[in-house]
Amino acid sequence: MNKNKISIVILAAGKGSRMKSSKAKVLHPICGKEMLYYIIKTSRAISDDVSVVVAHQRDAVVESMSRYFNDINFVTQDAINFPGTGGAMKGVNIKNERVLVLNGDMPLVEKSSLDGFLEAQGDVVMSIFNLQNPSGYGRVIIEDAEVKKIVEQKDATLQELKVQSVNAGIYAFSKKIIEKYIPLLQNNNAQEEYYLTDIISMARNDGIKITPLLVNENEYKGVNSKKDLSDAEIIMQDKIKNSLMESGVTMQLPSTIYIEEGVVFEGECIVENGCRITGESKIINSHIKAHSVIEDSIVKNSDVGPLAHLRPASNIEDTHIGNFVEIKKSTLKGVKAGHLSYIGDATVDEGTNIGAGVITCNYDGINKYKTVIGKNVFIGSDSQLIAPVVIEDNVMIAAGTTLRSGKVNSGELVVSASKSRIIKDFYYKFFAKK
């Protein structure tokens, strides 16, 4: 589809007071990305001219979205002098002959449904959806495939109250309609705001046809509260996981699994129940076992868990990570770490075995230090490696060893535990004193 046919304006200037949050509404996350991210991503799929209107927490919104997109026009609304959705359009320069106006709080909108606005004919296209219970909504009265009027519930007749069509709040206009009617908008209403919907009534009064376009309520329903946010995340999770399963990922009890938008799977992968995979994690030909957490990490040809935790910047390949093992900012290749270990700020090479209870002590209260472990190293259970430490290839660390900062040369054995003492009949003597 030709991306030059339509411009898109996304309204993202509002405070979102119903969110009851100090954070701008459009910056609230859904599956790891701000809700505004999704509608921008979808918009860029059909247009080369995308503008985002900002006002409330402008700098935070611009900074956040600039991390993902470098070709978006940010327009700052003069919310003091020109508040409202109509006021938001006053500073926008439209490149193409048609413009689609979207809301920043609609993260679930699909490209396929936006295509309908490109195909619809007419200078003004107005989105509608049908509700089983439209109570509280203004009704859209349609006759002969044309919007005849929009009537608020309090002003509707008994017959009009039976209508289930309501305004979905998305519009497509020809450029000439915007150029003609935006300067004519007035704010003589109770809120003293400039409303984009007034263009509909002005155009209709001038005999211009208003074309209705039926859209999916679940996609176009705005996210206005924390409850809406939760509902949207459930729907988005289903979309993400269904797409992954269709591409070949096996999921056990997918309703218990959480996977964020930026996660990538390649090859044959299995994800068991209760797992959480976030950030820009990449899973390649691997098995993620039950209740494991993976954050911004790469897992290749490996198995992880159950109940393992890969924190950000972990990179494992051809490796076994067992239960209750935590990895942070470390690279492991061809390694076995079966249980109850913490590996942080470390590089561990192939053939190395990490025993139960092994800890890399990487932090002295001020600075972080690296641990480097070579090939074919055997580290016994309950050992502490106090970084900075370098362990060359083919080394053995005895169980219970505390290895203090330094270097261990190839072929060496490190033992720090003293020989155990056995005191005969001590138990009986000790408790006899009680």
UniProtKB/Swiss-Prot annotation:
Subunit structure: Homotrimer.
Localization terms from the record: Cytoplasm
Organism, as annotated: Sulfurimonas denitrificans (strain ATCC 33889 / DSM 1251)
Pathway this chain belongs to: Nucleotide-sugar biosynthesis; UDP-N-acetyl-alpha-D-glucosamine biosynthesis; N-acetyl-alpha-D-glucosamine 1-phosphate from alpha-D-glucosamine 6-phosphate (route II): step 2/2; Nucleotide-sugar biosynthesis; UDP-N-acetyl-alpha-D-glucosamine biosynthesis; UDP-N-acetyl-alpha-D-glucosamine from N-acetyl-alpha-D-glucosamine 1-phosphate: step 1/1; Bacterial outer membrane biogenesis; LPS lipid A biosynthesis
Cofactor note: Binds 1 Mg(2+) ion per subunit.
Function text: Catalyzes the last two sequential reactions in the de novo biosynthetic pathway for UDP-N-acetylglucosamine (UDP-GlcNAc). The C-terminal domain catalyzes the transfer of acetyl group from acetyl coenzyme A to glucosamine-1-phosphate (GlcN-1-P) to produce N-acetylglucosamine-1-phosphate (GlcNAc-1-P), which is converted into UDP-GlcNAc by the transfer of uridine 5-monophosphate (from uridine 5-triphosphate), a reaction catalyzed by the N-terminal domain.
The name this protein goes by in its record: Bifunctional protein GlmU
Swiss-Prot/TrEMBL cofactor(s): Mg(2+)
GO process annotations (BP): cell morphogenesis; cell wall organization; lipid A biosynthetic process; peptidoglycan biosynthetic process; regulation of cell shape; UDP-N-acetylglucosamine biosynthetic process
UniProt family annotation: In the N-terminal section; belongs to the N-acetylglucosamine-1-phosphate uridyltransferase family. In the C-terminal section; belongs to the transferase hexapeptide repeat family.
Active site annotation, chain numbering: 339 (proton acceptor)
